[in-house]
């Protein structure tokens, strides 16, 4: 009797321990937004020229800070009297209160700066440049809300009625407006994204299990995992160990809930199968645990290690996602191999009601749809892998048309927030770079020579040294040239001019630095392309080693990796067609191929690990060719369900008004479905059946009779 009670007692202790852990970390997860860093310049390595420029620019500003321009565009007929009214109103801007607090906007203005307006040459618009303190706006308000979106909201609430009274339209735009709207989009992560993801997962689990009760246990376990991982990440970010931005927080939520639910599905499926062969839930769980622990841990390790390779990235945002995702996946694995088994053992067989698996019942997994698929592959394996392989190759051919040369801030939104509309209207009245010029830091005596060189660069509309009432500002023998471009500072056209600007100034003096918003965007694209070249080969090597060790076979490791990489390029091909011709996106971020690769290859390998570990187990009993068909039959339903869950969770990213996350969500959702329905269900089993026992070379299994 005591031996029977011991597993139950252990299960109770595990559940109590998890409630304690989540009770501590859960509330901290709610604060994760307050430690986000969404400024592009903060993501660049110290070696980037624009980063060096930022550090030098800080020494020019009073209070050791950098100017962060926020623009207010007022459209209407401008006369002397109206301009006077606008300037008078601008004097009240420093007194605006932020985010429902008593904190005035003046606290975040660049010391010594004045808020003034100047009219457009066409007399149809006025532009006010509000210079914010770049260091101060990185703080949070007393209510833990980020400062910048609160400033943007306060300016809009103030200027909208004022402009209306004048018969004008107002738009808060520029770097401050665009990033403020970016923060606003990420602000939905805590509520809209999380609740939608939970709802989607719950809906799919109810359909999969056809039980009014069972779905709750894996979902609750996944929520415990997310809360715990989020709390750990908050503590690390608060202590400056890792960088968190809105994208990485959103990806964390869908990754933990999606991957965690996948692992839960695998365990529950095997547990249900074993309940047909064991008289007690404890005995069934022991057998299920033995059969699923290795593939779950191996799958989690593959994803986590693949994400950790992002630590090799130049971009700190990518480096931050590495440990963030790895922590999330690791906690998800730990939760699903500890908390979920404890829940299942405590609730017993009845948790599967109304489809309760009975001892000695026939397991339905060996009949039905997946038995038919298995029989089809078994009858004509060569035709199966040739047709599916050719389909993937054709789709992969379109991957060369995917545009990954980066997005401007205005192209980064799926809709048209006020900052994007304002940025477009700004170009009708002012040079695109007005209010946010490219910064050239140089020795004071070189100003005439460098200015002459810059005026000869295509797209440069104005060159002027930074000055105050006393004249040109000089700090330690250095000055700043403000270079105004004809196009928006974050546009591809402006970015493409940075090399020419740098070549022009360095022809005078190699020590001259070019910085500012446009240079930051250009250097970010360069760093992203470096990350693509560096990280992807390392991930491929790492995954090959993990597969080889897990399956004890070089042939199967290379085979699986090859099919998943082919699936990745096929997905990129479909993305190119959809993004260009259906969604109408301007392109994709330079980091998109890397993010898509990390998730598609690492998560795609997951399903092949689930399949092939079971195939190896069955091959030892009945031979490779029969074993692969049996493995496909018994894992088909659960792996497809897992793929649907993961696709749905990443697809939820599409509800956010951000092009990068919408594109990533589509890519992962489509790629995972392609992998589960085509690659893992037909291509891999057909190839294994064709190759036979040699697929396990050099292990002993390769020499067994088939």
Tell me the role of every PLM-derived stretch.
Residues 1-37, 135, 140-404, 509, ...:
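Membrane-embedded transmembrane helical bundles of large multi-pass transporters/channels
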Residues 37, 46-67, 76-176, 401-587, ...:
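Structured non-transmembrane domains adjacent to transmembrane bundles in polytopic membrane proteins
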């Amino acid at each position: 009797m005591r031996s029977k009670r011991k597993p139950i007692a252990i299960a109770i202790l595990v559940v109590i321990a998890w409630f304690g852990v989540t009770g501590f970390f859960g509330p901290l997860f709610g604060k994760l937004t307050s430690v986000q860093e969404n400024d592009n310049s903060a993501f660049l390595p110290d070696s980037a020229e624009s980063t060096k420029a930022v550090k030098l620019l800080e020494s020019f500003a009073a209070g050791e800070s950098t100017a962060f321009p926020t623009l207010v565009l007022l459209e209407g007929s401008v006369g002397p009297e109206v301009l006077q009214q606008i300037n008078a109103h601008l004097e009240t801007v420093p007194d605006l209160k932020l985010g429902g607090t008593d904190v005035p906007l003046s606290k975040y203005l660049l010391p010594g700066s004045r808020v003034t307006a100047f009219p457009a040459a066409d007399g149809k618009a006025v532009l006010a440049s509000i210079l914010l303190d770049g260091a101060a706006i990185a703080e949070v308000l007393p209510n833990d809300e980020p400062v910048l979106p609160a400033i943007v909201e306060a300016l809009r609430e103030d200027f909208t009625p004022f402009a209306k009274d004048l018969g004008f339209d107002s738009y808060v735009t520029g770097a401050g407006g665009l990033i403020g709207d970016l923060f606003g989009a990420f602000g939905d992560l805590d509520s809209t994204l999380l609740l939608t993801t939970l709802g989607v997962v719950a809906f799919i689990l109810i359909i999969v299990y056809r039980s009014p009760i069972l779905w709750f246990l894996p979902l609750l376990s996944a929520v415990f995992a997310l809360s715990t991982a989020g709390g750990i990440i908050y503590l690390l970010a608060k202590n400056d160990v890792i960088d968190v931005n809105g994208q990485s927080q959103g990806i964390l939520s869908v990754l933990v809930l999606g991957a965690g639910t996948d692992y839960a599905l695998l365990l529950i499926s095997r547990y249900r199968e074993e309940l047909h062969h064991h008289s007690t839930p404890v005995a069934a769980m022991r057998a299920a645990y033995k059969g699923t622990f290795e593939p779950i841990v191996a799958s989690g390790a593959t994803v986590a290690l693949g994400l950790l390779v992002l630590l090799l990235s130049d971009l700190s945002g990518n480096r931050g996602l590495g440990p963030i995702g790895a922590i999330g996946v690791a906690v998800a694995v730990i939760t699903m191999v500890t908390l979920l088994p404890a829940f299942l053992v405590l609730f017993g067989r009845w948790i599967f009601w109304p489809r309760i698996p009975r001892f000695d019942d026939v397991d339905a997994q060996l009949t039905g749809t997946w038995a038919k698929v298995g029989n089809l592959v078994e009858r004509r394996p060569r035709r199966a892998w040739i047709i599916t392989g050719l389909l993937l190759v054709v789709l992969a051919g379109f991957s060369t048309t995917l545009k990954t040369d980066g997005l401007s801030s205005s192209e980064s939104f799926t809709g048209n927030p006020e900052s994007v509309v304002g940025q477009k209207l700004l170009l009708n009245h002012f040079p695109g770079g007005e209010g946010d010029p490219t910064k050239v830091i140089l020795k004071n005596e070189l100003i005439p020579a460098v200015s002459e060189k810059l005026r000869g660069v295509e797209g440069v509309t104005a060159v002027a040294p930074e000055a105050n009432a006393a004249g040109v500002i000089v700090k330690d023998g250095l000055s700043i040239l403000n270079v105004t471009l004809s196009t928006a500072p974050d546009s591809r056209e402006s970015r493409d001019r940075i090399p020419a600007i740098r070549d022009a100034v360095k022809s005078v003096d190699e020590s001259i630095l070019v910085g500012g918003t446009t240079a930051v965007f250009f250097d970010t694209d360069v760093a992203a392309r470096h990350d693509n070249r560096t990280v992807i080969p390392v991930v491929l090597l790492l995954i090959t080693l993990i597969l080889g060790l897990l399956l004890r076979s070089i042939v199967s490791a290379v085979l699986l990796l090859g099919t998943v990489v082919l699936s990745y390029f096929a997905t990129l091909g479909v993305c190119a067609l959809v993004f260009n011709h259906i969604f109408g996106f301007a392109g994709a971020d330079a980091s998109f191929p890397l993010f898509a690769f990390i998730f598609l290859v690492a998560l795609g390998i997951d399903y092949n690990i689930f399949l092939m570990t079971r195939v190896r187990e069955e091959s030892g009993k009945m031979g490779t060719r029969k074993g692969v068909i049996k493995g496909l039959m018994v894992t088909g339903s659960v792996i497809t369900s897992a793929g649907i869950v993961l696709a749905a969770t990443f697809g939820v990213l599409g509800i956010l008004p951000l092009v990068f996350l919408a594109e990533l969500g589509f890519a992962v959702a489509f790629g995972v479905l392609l992998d589960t329905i085509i690659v893992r269900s037909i291509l891999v089993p057909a190839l294994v059946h064709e190759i036979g026992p040699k697929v396990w070379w050099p292990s002993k299994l390769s020499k067994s009779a088939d």
